[in-house]
């Protein structure tokens, strides 16, 4: 049992290290995440990014170099790398954090860049979005500014399911700017309720209005949405 636990911990640690390495190397390619799957002939590595060509490189040169690094330094056996476009990049916090960092490095004003980031996220259907930019923004003294739109949950059971959070770093002449992007995904949260009214007859022949409250909950078995109703 101890050996099994150690095996899974090592796999998780390797994935975290690979993820951090790829995020550092390919943030300009809007790196979004990685999947590592062990196969009978080696290791399948699927990289998601907003701009896949920057990771692939000319003639696949960058991919070949990356495969050597993953095998030599991270112990991945015969890595087969696939680079694919991130699905809904505007709803991926890591992609948007890297985009914001790149915009700041190009000279965009932090407030304008953060506002554009918020608008793009909300235009893609997000329930809420929050952007925090910190550093020497307007003076020699470090501070931060926060922009928020919609609903952004800070705690609760559903936090890991509907909240995506990421950070990025922009290197500027005044110093290092830190950016944080938080996105509430376009899914129903467990605190949503629906009120349904219906008219029923009483024993005396009168009419009464009954309100049913439906709590919208996540169906864990099917991954869908189910209603648990009570009066």
Swiss-Prot record:
UniProt-listed CDD domains: KH-II_30S_S3_arch
Superkingdom, taxonomy of origin: Archaea
Molecular function GO terms recorded: rRNA binding; structural constituent of ribosome
InterPro entries cross-referenced by the UniProt entry: KH_dom, KH_dom-like_a/b, KH_dom_type_2, KH_sf_prok-type, Ribosomal_S3_C_sf, Ribosomal_uS3_arc, Ribosomal_uS3_C, Ribosomal_uS3_CS
Keyword list, A-Z: Ribonucleoprotein, Ribosomal protein, RNA-binding, rRNA-binding
Domain KH type-2: 18-97
One Gene Ontology term from the biological process aspect of the record: translation
GO cellular component: cytosolic small ribosomal subunit
Pfam families documented for this protein: KH_2, Ribosomal_S3_C
Intrachain disulfide bonds: none
Purpose of the protein: Binds the lower part of the 30S subunit head.
Family: Belongs to the universal ribosomal protein uS3 family.
Subunit structure: Part of the 30S ribosomal subunit.
Annotated protein name in UniProt: Small ribosomal subunit protein uS3
Biological source species: Sulfolobus acidocaldarius (strain ATCC 33909 / DSM 639 / JCM 8929 / NBRC 15157 / NCIMB 11770)
Gene: rps3
């Amino acid at each position: 049992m101890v050996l099994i636990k150690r095996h899974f911990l090592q796999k998780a640690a390797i994935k975290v290290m690979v993820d951090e390495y790829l995020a550092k190397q390919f943030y300009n390619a809007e790196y979004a995440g990685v999947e590592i799957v062990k196969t009978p002939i080696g290791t399948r590595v699927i990289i998601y990014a907003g701009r896949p060509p920057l990771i692939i490189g000319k003639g696949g040169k960058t991919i070949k170099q990356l495969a050597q690094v993953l095998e030599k330094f991270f112990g991945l056996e015969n890595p087969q790398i696939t680079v694919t476009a991130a699905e809904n990049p505007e709803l991926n916090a890591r992609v948007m954090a890297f985009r914001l960092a790149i915009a700041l490095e190009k000279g965009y004003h932090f407030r304008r860049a953060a506002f554009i980031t918020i608008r793009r996220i909300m235009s893609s259907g997000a329930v809420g979005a929050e952007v925090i930019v910190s550093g020497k923004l307007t003076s020699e003294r470090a501070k931060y500014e926060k922009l928020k739109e919609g609903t952004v949950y800070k705690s609760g059971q559903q936090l890991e399911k509907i909240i995506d959070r990421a950070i990025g770093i922009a290197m500027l002449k005044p110093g290092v700017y830190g950016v944080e992007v938080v996105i509430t995904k376009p899914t129903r949260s467990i605190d949503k309720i629906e009120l349904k009214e219906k008219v029923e007859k009483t024993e005396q022949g009168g009419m009464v209005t009954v309100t049913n409250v439906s709590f919208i909950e996540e169906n864990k078995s099917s991954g869908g949405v189910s209603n648990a109703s009570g009066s």
